[in-house]
């Protein structure tokens, strides 16, 4: 059973929506399916093609051996948890991690965001419900940790401002910003609410939206969404 590989890149290619590398490890060539994000970094020479380390999930089938490579053990273990769900195959698991980060998936589970899960190719309504239900039980501690963190960061006593924040999140989502991006800037927005409220008697939703979009645009200029 192969669980970890370190070697040099020999080749990389794409077949439909599958992304592969050929790694030379001590004279042996290993064909490994990888995530699209890592594939693009290799193709654009953004990372070295020497001494590549991949955490590998080895799946044995009757007619073949499949290797799936990840840049972290956390990704690999998350992939394994997804595969443990009835009816979910390796390509669904890869599809989820191609489209979303682990934290985004956990947030979707927490909020029961079936629409987001269904946006992964191959996942329908019933499978999204099963994924949310079963992954929720598998990642209880992570979900509780996120909830406690959110409560600590986003606790606001004023119900009117709370409503503004909720509306702000929904508006930003409708403008195609990702949940991860929104969650990253919300604590900053909330810290500035007191200052805005003291300086201006008419703190409005429009001012919060403008402020949020300014921070999001600053982030997107450094990190492509």
Swiss-Prot record:
Task: Name which cysteines form disulfide bonds.
Answer: none
One of the record's GO molecular function terms: ATP binding
Gene3D superfamilies linked: 5' to 3' exonuclease, C-terminal subdomain, Nucleic acid-binding proteins
Q: Which keywords does UniProt give here?
A: Cytoplasm, DNA damage, DNA recombination, DNA repair, DNA-binding
For this entry, list what GO says about its biological process. DNA recombination; DNA repair
According to the UniProt record, where is the region Flexible linker?
151-161
Q: Where is this region: Domain II?
A: 72-150
Residue ranges of region Domain I? 1-71
- Signal sequence span per UniProt? none
**GO CC annotation: what is one?**
cytoplasm
**Any idea where this protein resides?**
Cytoplasm
Give the region (Domain III) as residue ranges.
161-225
Pfam families in UniProt: HHH_5, RuvA_N
Its principal location? cytoplasm
Subunit details:
Homotetramer. Forms an RuvA(8)-RuvB(12)-Holliday junction (HJ) complex. HJ DNA is sandwiched between 2 RuvA tetramers; dsDNA enters through RuvA and exits via RuvB. An RuvB hexamer assembles on each DNA strand where it exits the tetramer. Each RuvB hexamer is contacted by two RuvA subunits (via domain III) on 2 adjacent RuvB subunits; this complex drives branch migration. In the full resolvosome a probable DNA-RuvA(4)-RuvB(12)-RuvC(2) complex forms which resolves the HJ.
Role of this protein:
The RuvA-RuvB-RuvC complex processes Holliday junction (HJ) DNA during genetic recombination and DNA repair, while the RuvA-RuvB complex plays an important role in the rescue of blocked DNA replication forks via replication fork reversal (RFR). RuvA specifically binds to HJ cruciform DNA, conferring on it an open structure. The RuvB hexamer acts as an ATP-dependent pump, pulling dsDNA into and through the RuvAB complex. HJ branch migration allows RuvC to scan DNA until it finds its consensus sequence, where it cleaves and resolves the cruciform DNA.
Q: What is known of its domains?
A: Has three domains with a flexible linker between the domains II and III and assumes an 'L' shape. Domain III is highly mobile and contacts RuvB.
Q: Provide the family line.
A: Belongs to the RuvA family.
Q: Which NCBIfam families match?
A: ruvA (TIGR00084)
Q: What is this protein called?
A: Holliday junction branch migration complex subunit RuvA
Species this chain originates from = Prochlorococcus marinus (strain MIT 9301)
Q: Which gene encodes it?
A: ruvA
């Amino acid at each position: 059973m192969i669980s970890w590989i370190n070697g040099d890149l020999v080749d990389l290619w794409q077949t439909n929506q599958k992304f592969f590398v050929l790694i030379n490890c001590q004279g042996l060539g290993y064909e490994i399916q990888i995530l699209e994000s890592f594939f693009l970094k290799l193709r654009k020479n953004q990372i070295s093609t020497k001494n590549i380390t991949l955490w590998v999930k080895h799946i044995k089938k009757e007619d073949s051996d499949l290797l799936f490579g990840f840049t972290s053990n956390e990704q690999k273990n998350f992939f394994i948890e997804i595969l443990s769900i009835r009816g979910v195959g390796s390509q669904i698991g890869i599809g989820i991690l191609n489209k979303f980060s682990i934290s985004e998936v956990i947030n979707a589970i927490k909020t029961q965001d079936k629409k987001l899960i269904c946006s992964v190719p191959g996942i329908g309504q019933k499978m999204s419900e099963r994924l949310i239900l079963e992954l929720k039980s598998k990642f209880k501690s992570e979900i509780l940790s996120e909830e406690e963190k959110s409560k600590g960061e986003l606790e606001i006593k004023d119900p009117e401002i709370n409503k503004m924040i909720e509306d702000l999140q929904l508006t930003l989502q409708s403008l195609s910003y990702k949940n991860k991006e929104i969650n990253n800037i919300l604590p900053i927005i909330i810290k500035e609410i007191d200052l805005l409220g003291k300086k201006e008697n008419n703190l409005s939703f429009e001012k919060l939206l403008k402020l949020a979009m300014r921070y999001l645009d600053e982030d997107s200029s450094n990190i492509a969404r």
